Each structure stands twice: as structure tokens, then as C-alpha cells.
Regions:
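Conserved phosphate-donor/acceptor-positioning beta-strand/loop module used by diverse small-molecule
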Residues: 105, 111-112, 129, 138-162
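Short aromatic-enriched loop/helix-cap "lid" or pocket-rim segments at secondary-structure transitions
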Residues: 27-33, 119-121, 158-162
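NTP-dependent small-molecule kinase module
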Residues: 157-238
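N-terminal phosphate/diphosphate-binding loop that engages ATP/GTP or pyrophosphate donors
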Residues: 2-75
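Hydrophobic/aromatic beta-strand patches that form the interior of the parallel beta-sheet core
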Residues: 17, 145-147, 201, 212
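Glycine-rich phosphate-binding loop used to anchor ATP phosphates in small-molecule kinases
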Residues: 55-137
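Short loop/turn segments at strand-loop or loop-helix junctions that form parts
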Residues: 22, 70, 109-113, 117-118, ...
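Glycine-rich, phosphate-binding/catalytic loops in enzymes
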Residues: 6-7, 124-127, 163-166
Length: 238
């Protein structure tokens, strides 16, 4: 869906652009095409911008690392280090986008601060601590609009079993069931946040894109995002 949306609106004003494309344009690395090198560069750029702006995000970073330190031994050190890297990278990428974004661009970010919530709290072997989820949500910046792609739990389970998931080591039906249940529990917590609800766009299919709240409390950006999503879907089918 992201590619369809970007392709449909890349020549518009404001331009719709994927976050990684935006980052590489700002850093003058658009010439870099190799997927692995782009992933490495994204991690390094995110780390640098996180370090340069860490004073702005001390509460978030302190919370994240303290929570990772308290995790039970069932969560391996390797997994914790990976999550810590993602926290640093996503924080840095957010700061870069915030610094260079303008009214001429709409940056679509598929791994931002809200994705940090998923990485920190969703595990196969333990249920999420909802109180801690709420605490982190009170500290992180919320984007102008949040897109929620929904699918029945059965479909999510089938897709995960078919594709595999690097955070579900066992790969069994029971392990996948537990991981998805914990993920859905965290997403319900996100949807319950007043700040997120008014910026949330629910996508069940290309023909079912609508604001999560319909009582007039939604963000002014939501209707514009809905138009972009629907036109991107139609363009992709044409």
C-alpha cells in the first residue's frame, strides 16, 4: 500500500514521500540503491541523529533502556540489543524528519515512535504490561496522523505462519497465537489513547478507509490522509 500511495502522489504538492526516501534525499544518498547498504545507512543515520538530539528524548530513552533491563531471562540479550538499536534508530529518524520536513511534503513513516511501543512490549513468551504501555505513550510524540491496517486475527495468524517472523523463535501455531494476541492487546491500548484516537485512520480494505472517531474530534489532517489512502488504492488497482 505504501508504494501505491507514494507512486500516486509523488508529483503532487504536497509531495507524498516514504520516510527512507526522504532521509536519503536530505543526506544526499539517493544514489545508494543496494538494499543491504541502505539498511545499514539508515541505522547509522538514525543513531547519529539520535545522539545529536538525545537531550530532547531523555525520558523516552531512559524508560526504554530501563524496561529492557528489567525484562525476564526468557528475552535474550541479543533480542534486547536489537530492540535498543531500533529505539535509537527510530528516535533519530524522527528527529531528522522533524528538522527537515516542510509543508511541501507528507512523509509516510512506517517505523516511528509507535513502532517502538510494539517492539518494547510485544513478545511471544510474556503478556504486555499495559500500565507501562500507557506510561510510554504519555511521553512519545504522536504523528499528525496514524494509519491502522486491520485484519481478522485468523488472517494475521495464517499470514504469520506462512511467512514466519524473526521474533517468534518457535514458529509453532501456539507461539504465533500468543504473539499475535499480545500484539493486538497493545494495539487496543494504542487505540484507547485520546491523542491517538483523534489522529487515527482505520483501514480495513481499500473500500473501507475512515477516521477512527466520527464525532468531529479527529485531527484536521485525517480527512486529507483518507483521500490520499483511497486514491492510492484506486491507482494501484488501475
Amino acid at each position: 500500500m505504501l508504494r501505491k500511495i507514494v507512486d500516486r502522489h509523488q508529483d503532487d504538492c504536497p509531495e507524498v514521500i516514504a520516510a527512507q526516501t526522504f532521509v536519503f534525499r536530505v543526506i544526499h544518498l539517493s544514489w545508494l540503491k543496494n538494499a543491504m547498504l541502505r539498511r545499514i545507512a539508515t541505522n547509522l543515520i538514525g543513531l547519529v541523529y539520535c545522539l545529536l538530539n538525545c537531550h530532547k528524548n531523555i525520558p523516552i530513552l531512559n524508560f526504554s533502556f530501563a524496561y529492557l533491563k528489567r525484562l525476564p531471562s526468557t528475552i535474550s540479550l541479543r533480542e534486547r540489543i536489537k530492540i535498543a538499536r531500533i529505539v535509537l534508530r527510530n528516535t533519530g529518524i524522527y528527529e531528522l524528519i522533524r528538522r527537515y520536513d516542510s509543508k511541501e511534503t507528507i512523509v509516510v513513516l512506517d517505523e516511528g515512535f509507535l513502532q517502538i511501543v510494539h517492539y518494547l512490549f510485544v513478545y511471544e513468551s510474556m503478556a504486555p504490561d499495559i500500565k507501562q504501555v500507557d506510561k510510554l505513550l504519555s511521553q512519545i510524540p504522536i504523528p499528525d496522523a496514524v494509519i491502522l491496517l486491520s485484519a481478522p486475527k485468523r488472517v494475521l495468524k495464517e499470514r504469520t505462519l506462512a511467512r514466519g517472523h524473526d521474533r517468534i523463535k518457535a514458529g509453532s501455531s501456539e507461539a504465533v497465537e500468543a504473539f499475535i494476541s499480545h500484539a493486538l492487546e497493545v494495539f487496543e491500548c494504542l487505540k484507547a489513547s485520546p491523542e491517538i484516537r483523534q489522529r487515527l485512520v482505520a483501514v480495513n480494505s481499500c473500500s473501507n478507509v475512515q477516521p477512527f472517531v466520527t464525532n468531529g474530534d479527529q485531527s484536521s489532517d485525517v480527512n486529507r490522509i483518507i483521500e490520499i489512502l483511497i486514491s492510492g488504492c484506486i491507482y494501484g488497482r488501475a
